[in-house]
Swiss-Prot record:
Residues 1-31 form the signal peptide. The lineage of its organism: Eukaryota, Metazoa, Chordata, Craniata, Vertebrata. It is found in: Secreted. Interacts with LRP6. Interacts (via the C-terminal Cys-rich domain) with LRP5 (via beta-propeller regions 3 and 4); the interaction, enhanced by MESD and or KREMEN, antagonizes Wnt-mediated signaling. Forms a ternary complex with LRP6 and KREM1. Interacts with KREM1. It comes from Homo sapiens. This is Dickkopf-related protein 1. Residues 85-138 are annotated as: DKK-type Cys-1. The gene is DKK1.
Length: 266
């Protein structure tokens, strides 16, 4: 009888201990708290800098970073790295090489996003693919849209400026034949094929214009290493057919720094 009583007391003691452990706040709730905290961790991050103060538990947006449109490729502001360049050919098809700000450091150029139709330009490379620069404005390369784009843009740009157009027609039309006309001396260009016969496309300041191909006896530039022409602000054309750029004969005895190169017969 005493043995049965002792066994019963043991069972009661074990049951009490189990009940006490099951009701302990640290043991009974710990698993639930861990699960809740883990599942809501992303929602309870502190707000970003510049966020509203006093709301530490506000949700963090999962939207991607803001795109920076002024560089060689669309990148987030945090990752944006401007790509330095010396000429347009070093940039992508939808970019051009120029100083980032007007009046900025003239010695620093980066690849900038191309300009869309009806935006101002100084050369063809500034306009996005499918457009080209005409009279300082990016217009469509499609001949069917050429006349309408120019007329509409000129009307919008100068239609309300009476002092500028005093004595002149408010609407200017351009013949579609101009689309096929090769650039003359001084015209903006992208490559030599844009210029008329006897001209080449060469750098002039930070743009390119059509310049005369050099003739016999004219001063030329001899490039000692490949790619050095990209550093010239006032680039010369190449020598004409049958000519090459050589040191002028009467300057053979001069110092290396003062040697003069001219276009001479082979």
């Amino acid at each position: 009888m005493m043995a049965l009583g002792a066994a019963g007391a043991t069972r009661v003691f074990v049951a009490m201990v189990a009940a006490a452990l099951g009701g302990h706040p640290l043991l009974g709730v710990s698993a639930t708290l861990n699960s809740v905290l883990n599942s809501n961790a992303i929602k309870n991050l502190p707000p970003p800098l510049g966020g509203a103060a006093g709301h530490p538990g506000s949700a963090v947006s999962a939207a991607p970073g803001i795109l920076y449109p002024g560089g060689n490729k669309y990148q987030t502001i945090d990752n944006y790295q401007p790509y330095p360049c010396a000429e347009d050919e070093e940039c992508g098809t939808d970019e051009y090489c120029a100083s980032p700000t007007r009046g900025g450091d003239a010695g620093v150029q980066i690849c900038l996003a191309c300009r869309k139709r009806r935006k101002r330009c100084m050369r063809h490379a500034m306009c996005c693919p499918g457009n080209y620069c005409k009279n300082g404005i990016c217009v469509s390369s499609d001949q069917n849209h050429f006349r309408g784009e120019i007329e509409e843009t000129i009307t919008e740009s100068f239609g309300n400026d009476h002092s500028t157009l005093d004595g002149y027609s408010r609407r200017t039309t351009l013949s579609s034949k101009m689309y096929h006309t090769k650039g003359q001396e001084g015209s903006v260009c992208l490559r030599s094929s844009d210029c008329a016969s006897g001209l080449c496309c060469a750098r002039h300041f930070w743009s390119k214009i059509c310049k005369p191909v050099l003739k016999e006896g004219q001063v030329c530039t001899k490039h000692r290493r490949k790619g050095s022409h990209g550093l010239e602000i006032f680039q010369r054309c190449y020598c004409g057919e049958g000519l090459s750029c050589r040191i002028q004969k009467d300057h053979h005895q001069a110092s290396n720094s003062s040697r003069l190169h001219t276009c001479q017969r082979h």
